[in-house]
């Protein structure tokens, strides 16, 4: 590419440190929960999460759009809830780090605008206003230089006055300075950059913001503080006024954004409780942790500055218990399935009260199915109590969605169950120019749980409830799940791979002749080298341990790289400096330099023609000289 037609280089990207814990704070998360967060996140997104955790000042809405990550396959069953909890953890961690940035900014601004530098700044402002002679008083500007409440309206009014002074003096921003404006939002997306007129002023402001965001403990600087008295110009005084006014407004805006982010983190937890309630019904052993979480949220809403550590601890503790329950968390789908089943039961009950099912011939609905089919009743002939009927569409009867916990009397008795009277299914309609809603109360969630538990234990719901009441007294034993593993194939059995068979064969040959030396075969030499588990998983992860254990049980002495979780292929994530969309420009800038992908290879294997293929027998309806269209298709495939 020629030098003249070369695309202009983009603004420098920020360099932010990411530690081994992805910048998760130790005062918010314990070591156990930090390890859990690292195990749930893939390797491909770890650096990006560390960048978000660093606390670069950003608007809340921009940060919500930027938070992105992937969850490992080992946590697939809890993924719907894990994604929301991880997002809350990232927002809370970002809030605490960004709050430290604001504290440093306030301290250094007060140090900057103090004597003796304050006196020199005011003298420069007086000389600036006198030289312009526009009627702008120095007091109109200086009153905001030490204030903590410089709103956006106050900032605009002060900038209008400074622009009048600038125009009267004939000062304009140089093209070199305008080209460096994007640097001003590299380390702070909340900063409203003023029109600095010199390159030196732009670079100095960018360095100040970089030092504050990265918490380097360097004092803020201005042109008046770094230049000698004889070398200061009116343009330097103008740029210093720009710097102080915009930093004072940044201080206020940052504080307001942190207040909104603090309340938003609590609100996200509050909204998550709707899904966590159905997760609790799927794993009743999480009752105590769920109740503690809700009580903590109630206290957090009553304080102006809630502590995030207890709330985050309960969230991650609940997620750990849900992961150990080994059920598929699907709160939204479970909510809808409960509504469908309860509505069907209610409609059949209402029809029975109206006497619509009096005769056998009348037990047909509009679609021609009998009432039993409409109720979705299913017989269980393998139950110990004889022939039982259960609702086939009750998800609580599925062991992969709801599993009866150990000692069910501790969690499934009526007085131990956490009721939620206002469980609503809401439908939205549009009527006469307005959005209207229809609500349906789900009042039998506990009955559905008992019905599903009785199906898994092979008991009637009445008998199951009796055992729950008598088991704590020692009169009856706890109900247990009826296993039917011998009726079905074991799909979780680990297959014996080629590496396992070759290793077992070599071990048997070596044991038969201890003095003999076996050479590797051609098949084993062409196989791919096994990649160690530490390449893809963190130390001490349960997935690696599970792979090692399962391979040892199946007789395999090596782990195939296909069994290990690899980081997904992702686009390169880079920080841009465009205001409110900081991670999009870099990709579009480098997009043109990508190499074009090669076309896909031609399909392998024999093509279907009239001479070969599944229907190569000659047809009697056509003559032998009739062309078959498959011949042309095969010829075209050969020339691809």
Swiss-Prot record:
Record's compositionally biased regions (Low complexity): 500-562
GO BP annotations, alphabetical order: DNA-templated viral transcription; symbiont-mediated suppression of host cytoplasmic pattern recognition receptor signaling pathway via inhibition of TBK1 activity; symbiont-mediated suppression of host toll-like receptor signaling pathway
Ranges annotated as biased composition (Basic and acidic residues): 631-640
Compositionally biased residues, Basic residues: 588-598
Cellular component terms per the entry's GO annotation: host cell cytoplasm; host cell nucleus; viral tegument
Key word Endoplasmic reticulum present: no
Region spans: Disordered: 353-373, 500-571, 586-640
Pfam families, alphabetized: Herpes_pp85 (PF04637)
Record field: compositional bias (Acidic residues): 358-367
Highest taxon above the source species: Viruses
Keyword Membrane annotated: no
Keyword tags: Host cytoplasm, Host nucleus, Host-virus interaction, Inhibition of host innate immune response by virus, Inhibition of host TBK1 by virus, Inhibition of host TLR pathway by virus, Viral immunoevasion, Virion, Virion tegument
Family of this protein: Belongs to the herpesviridae pp85 family.
The name this protein goes by in its record: Protein UL35
């Amino acid at each position: 590419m020629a030098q003249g037609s070369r695309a202009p280089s983009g603004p420098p990207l920020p360099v932010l440190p990411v530690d081994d814990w992805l910048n998760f704070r130790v005062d918010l998360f314990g070591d156990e929960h930090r390890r859990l967060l690292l195990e749930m996140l893939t390797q491909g997104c770890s650096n990006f999460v560390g960048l978000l955790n660093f606390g670069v000042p950003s608007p809340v809405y921009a940060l919500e759009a930027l938070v992105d990550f992937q969850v490992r396959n080992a946590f697939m069953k809890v993924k719907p809830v894990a994604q929301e909890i991880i997002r809350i953890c990232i927002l809370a961690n970002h809030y605490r780090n960004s709050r430290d940035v604001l504290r440093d900014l306030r301290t250094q601004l007060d140090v900057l605008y103090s004597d003796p530098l304050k006196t020199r700044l005011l003298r420069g402002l007086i000389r600036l206003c006198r030289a312009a002679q526009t009627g702008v008083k120095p007091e109109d500007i200086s009153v905001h230089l030490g204030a903590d409440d410089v709103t956006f309206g106050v900032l605009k009014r002060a900038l209008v006055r400074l622009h009048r002074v600038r125009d009267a003096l004939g000062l304009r921003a140089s093209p070199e300075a305008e080209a460096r404006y994007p640097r001003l939002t590299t380390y702070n997306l909340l900063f409203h950059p003023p029109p600095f007129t010199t390159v030196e002023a732009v670079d100095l402001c960018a360095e100040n913001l970089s030092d504050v965001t990265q918490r380097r403990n360097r004092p803020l600087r201005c042109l008046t503080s770094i230049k000698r008295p004889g070398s200061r110009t009116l343009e330097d005084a103008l740029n210093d006024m720009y710097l102080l006014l915009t930093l004072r407004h940044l201080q206020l805006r940052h504080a307001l954004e942190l207040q909104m982010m603090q309340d938003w983190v609590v609100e996200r937890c509050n909204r998550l409780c709707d899904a966590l309630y159905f997760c609790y019904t799927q794993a009743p052993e999480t009752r105590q942790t769920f109740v503690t979480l809700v009580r903590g949220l109630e206290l957090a809403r009553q304080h102006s500055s809630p502590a995030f550590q207890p709330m985050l601890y309960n969230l991650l503790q609940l997620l750990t218990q849900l992961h150990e329950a080994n059920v598929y968390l699907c709160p939204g789908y479970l909510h809808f399935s409960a509504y469908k089943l309860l509505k069907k039961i209610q409609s059949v009950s209402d029809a029975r009260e109206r006497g619509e099912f009096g005769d056998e011939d009348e037990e047909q609905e509009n679609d021609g199915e009998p009432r039993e089919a409409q109720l979705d009743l299913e017989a269980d002939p393998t139950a110990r109590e004889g022939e039982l009927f259960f609702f086939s569409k009750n998800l609580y009867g599925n062991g992969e969605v709801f599993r009866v916990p150990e000692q069910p009397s501790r969690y499934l008795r009526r007085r131990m169950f956490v009721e939620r009277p206002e469980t609503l299914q809401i439908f939205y309609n549009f009527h006469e120019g307005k959005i209207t809603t229809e609500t349906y109360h789900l009042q039998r969630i506990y009955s559905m749980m008992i019905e599903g538990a009785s199906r898994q234990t092979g008991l009637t719901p009445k008998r199951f409830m009796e055992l729950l009441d008598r088991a704590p007294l020692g009169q009856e034993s706890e109900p247990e799940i009826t296993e039917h593993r011998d009726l079905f194939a074991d799909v979780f059995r680990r297959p014996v791979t080629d590496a396992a068979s070759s290793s077992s064969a070599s071990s048997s040959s070596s044991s038969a002749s201890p003095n003999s030396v076996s050479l590797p075969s051609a098949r084993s030499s062409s196989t791919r080298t096994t990649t160690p588990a530490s390449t893809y998983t963190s130390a001490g992860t349960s997935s690696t341990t599970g792979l090692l254990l399962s391979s040892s049980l199946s007789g395999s002495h090596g782990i195939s790289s296909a069994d290990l979780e690899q980081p997904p292929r992702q686009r390169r994530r880079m920080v841009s400096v465009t205001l409110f969309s900081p991670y999009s420009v870099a990709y579009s800038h480098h997009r043109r330099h990508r190499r074009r992908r090669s076309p896909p290879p031609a399909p392998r294997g024999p093509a279907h023609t009239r001479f070969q293929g599944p229907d190569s027998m000659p047809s009697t309806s056509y003559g032998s000289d009739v062309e078959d269209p498959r011949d042309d298709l095969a010829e075209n495939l050969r020339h691809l």
